[in-house]
Every structure is written in C-alpha cells, then in structure tokens.
Amino acid sequence: MQPNSTVANDETLLYFSRAWKLGMQPNALLDHPDLQQVQIEGLLAIFLLALGHVNRAWRICGIAIRSATAMGLNLRSESNYVTLPSKESRYKVWWSLYTLETILGNMTGRPLNLDSDFCTTPLPVPFEEHEYNEAEVIRIMTDHKTRNNLLAHVITRPVGEMPAAGDVQSVRNAMDILNPNMALYFVCYVDLTRIMREIVETLYAPEIVQNSARDAEAAITDANAKLEKWLSKLPAGFRIVEEGGGGGGSLVTHDRYSLSLALHYYSATILACKPCLHYFDKPSSSSSGDSSFYTYVAASCVQAACRMLDLFPAEFDGTWLNQVAPWWCMLHYTVQATAVLLIDFSLCHPGSIPEASIQALEKAASWLNEMARIDLASRRACVVCGALLAKLSGVVGNRAGVAEEAVGSRSEVGLYR
C-alpha cells in the first residue's frame, strides 16, 4: 500500500505489463510448462492479489495449478535425477499454490479445485536451504517416514504414510536443531490451510444444506477440535502472547511469522464458527439441534473476530502494515472480522451489544478509513461497510460510523472489482 494510490497504481501496472510480456509469451499457454513457468504464473497471481485484482488473481492461480499438475508437482518425486534441494523446491512451489488458491477461494467464495486424494506431495522439511548439507537434514529429506515422524511434532497430520515408530534418534537430533524460521513457519501455515480447506468443504459446499442440524454440529465441533490441535502443536516461537491475563489482555506477537499465523488461525476459526451466526440457521426448540451449542459457537466466532482485530495496533500504522503484517491479504482479514461483527450486531437488540465488540468495530472502521485513503480496493470495501453500518445506526449509533470523505465516490472505487 502506497500513500499516493493513483501514482502507485500507474507504476505497478507498468511493472505488471513488463512481467506479463516477459513471462507470458504468446505460446505460454500451449507449450508444455516447466518449473520456471509455474513460478512465473504463481508470482503473477500473487502480484494481482496484492493489487486487489482478486478475480484476475484467482484465474491466473488456476492456470498455475494446471501447469503444476501437468508437471506432476502434486505427486511425490521418486526420480533419481532430481537433486534433494530441487525436490524440496518443487514441494514448496506446489504447497505455495495450494495456500494461494485457498486464500483466493475464501476471498471470492468460489469452490476449491485441488483434491487432496490426488496429492501425495510431502510437506517440505522445516529447515532453511543453507542447512540442506547437514547429515541429519539429508537423512530426513531422503527418508519419508523420518520426515513424517519429525513433522508429526509440529503439524496435525503429515502427508502420505502416517507416522510410525521409526528412527527415534534421528527425530530427536532433528528436533534439537529445529528453530523457528521461514521454512518452519511455512509448514505450520500450510498445515493450518489444509484444515481451513476441510472446513470450507464440510461447511460451505452447496450440498451441505441437505444435512441435518446434528451433522452440522458434528462438523463444526470436529473443525474446532482440529484447530485446537493445530494451536497446541504450534512451536513456542510462533505462539501469540496475551498481556494482562484473564482473557481480557491484548495480544502480542513476536514477529511477522507469528502475526501471520495468528491472523490465519482466527480467520479459520471464523470460518468454522460463522454458520452459527446466521439467525435463520439456528434450530428451533422443536428441532434436534441444541440452541445452546449454536449460541456458544456464535460467541466464539465474535470472539475470534475481536481477537483478530486486537492484533492490529490501536491506531493505524502504515509502517507496521507494510513491514510486519501480511499486507497482501490484510484487507481480507479486516473485512472478514468486520463482517462478523456486523452480522452479530444486526441480530442484537439496542443496548445489548458488549462494549468490547463495539470497540472492535470502531477499530475496524478506523483502519478501513485509513486504508481507504491509500488503496482503492480498501476504499471500495470501506464504501460497502459504511453502507451496512448506516443501516445499523439504530443499534450501534454513530460511534462506528465511517467518514464519508474518506471513502471517495462509488465510480472511483469500482476500479478494483
């Protein structure tokens, strides 16, 4: 996000056109893809996502996934001609596209196309590339059972063979040299993304509406159990810390890695609990569902939204946004939390809304206002949220109002649809 959105937009479009000319040759879609072409297509999708062109990013990501599948990146490499570092690079490319498709699918509400049943690509080893020459790391990269035994200590479920009693000493040696780093962060992020995809498939597929209330409750309970398991396995260096205690303190993260994982975790929690927010989906007293369950899960959803916003600084901080936060999807996180609060407020009676929720909505509105000044996609989101807030003025009053001069005209904000 840049202070002058018009100038920044012109510059980024210029860079994008150059990248497109260089990377997407006239026959790029007809030629057999190679690893470099897959990376180019994936980077173009990320670039479009960062610009706010989510629909275009979703389409290009689909092309990249097709190219990767054509290369067999969705399968574990058994080739003797591919070096171990090259295999790890291919694994990272595949899981990067996997996470990117999940993010874009959640943003657009479109179905996810990758089927886990057709994927045997193992998660990459949680070590930096400069450690690939160490004996223990080489052993883990070579032996898939040892790899899974190691990963079982930091993720909920490895890919491929389930962990079994193996070389315990190798795993212990590897754990001794395993430190929080970008590779370990990526493994934890992918593991959480896999849970998020399961949540989408079990709770948001159109055919799910045919399931009974008990089936929905079981799916939601299972999803939250998996999220809690993921959180319990998260390495200590990536965990968020609560200051103040008693469940009412502010949340503090150590660095960009822990902040990104925390935001992703609360986003997944919102996805798992959000079905219970909708008033008309709650079972009546005569149905088989338990209304107390829906009330509890709905409260958990609102709490996750408040916790997500609690990770933001009290006042808008452009430096924090660009240098610490995962800026490429911060608008999504902000709007996701705001939407939860707006839905909850629409179902509440005036005067019954907790003060903490109102403060969270005020904070979200303040951040959207400031982001709208420097980013056109944020400006459009600010217009939409402002219109919804206006309809809820009888419930929340003007405390969370969005300043009209900060959002711009509707014709201007349509650029990033």
Q: Where are the language model's segments positioned?
A:
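C-terminal, low-complexity intrinsically disordered regions in eukaryotic proteins
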Residues: 127, 136-172, 222, 286, ...
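Extended, leucine-rich alpha-helical cores of fungal transcription factors
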Residues: 1-122, 126, 174-229, 233, ...
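Conserved, structured regulatory domains from eukaryotic proteins
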Residues: 129-131
